[in-house]
Amino acid sequence: AYTCQELKIPATIFMPTTTPQQKITQVKFFGGDYADIALVGDTFDESATAAIDYARRENKTFIDPFDNPDVISGQGTVAVEIFEAARQEGIKIDLLLAAVGGGGLISGVSVYAKHVSPETKIIGVEASGARSMQAAFDHAGPIKLETIDKFADGIAVQKVGQLTYQIAKENVDELVNTDEGLISSTILDLYSKQGIVVEPAGATSVAALELIKDEIKGQTIVCIISGGNNDINRMQEIEEKSLIYEGLKHYFVVNFPQRPGALREFVNDILGPHDDITRFEYIKRANKGTGPVLIGILLSNKQDQAQLIERLAAFDSKFIDLKGQESLYNLLV
């Protein structure tokens, strides 16, 4: 979008209908009068297909967002700046991590990095719910994933490019993946400790450090933070996923005796002194001795979980921990 306005070249930019509003606003801001936005499809791949069809119908040039030599080269300039800064400081980079979606960034960065510093290890980081580059590595070529999770929407791609796959296969040393809970905790850490606002896709490289922390002690590491389009409206969701990942927030279905004082007993006997109830849903049933309650509990310390489970079992031996009930759990989180 910025290039369109800078070079005075009109363009139509296709994005999924699920694109966060903040990202749409930024595209409008940088594109100005030279960038029209078309929101089509629920995923990146559906939107890309629509863009290709539109370009054919209207006799326009389609520019792939990642599987294009010029796009790859442009993203590779990030590595040029990184290694030039390292050279000026006399620093040897042992490890470089970058997010992987369609593969444009990791391709451009890795091919330059291996040219100027062959000993630098390159790790590509995918979201656990959208491991399209790993699928390409496993099948000796790009394949389309049937479904993907769109939490890290900036890298939620069903199929990587042919060119990006070839470059990554040759230059990337390892692929790892990070789940949405770890990504969420990383987003909050970057904001609270460093004042950095980052979207889920942009946080993946830093999140991956948790996975390899025992292997990288004493090394010089660069994480490319690629994307700050974090819609403030998503922060509640991100905090929720982080608390669950950290083992602090839990959801249960517990059978309560249908008599006065049952809730008071639960609070006094089950909760720790610093624990909190974050959700409580209950409908009293007539002519029944007990009734199911959906309850969310926030612990002050994740080490208290085992004791909480023991007390819950004593209160209701048939209670349900919804973390093991994926279909129900996803309705809450």
Describe the residue ranges of each PLM region.
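Catalytic phosphate/nucleotide-handling subdomain of diverse soluble enzymes
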Residues: 210-240
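Small/polar-residue-rich loop-to-helix segments that shape phosphate-bearing ligand pockets
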Residues: 12-95, 126-179, 183
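Glycine-rich beta-alpha junction loops
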Residues: 67, 100-104, 126-131, 151, ...
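Active-site-adjacent helical/loop segments in soluble small-molecule enzymes
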Residues: 161-219
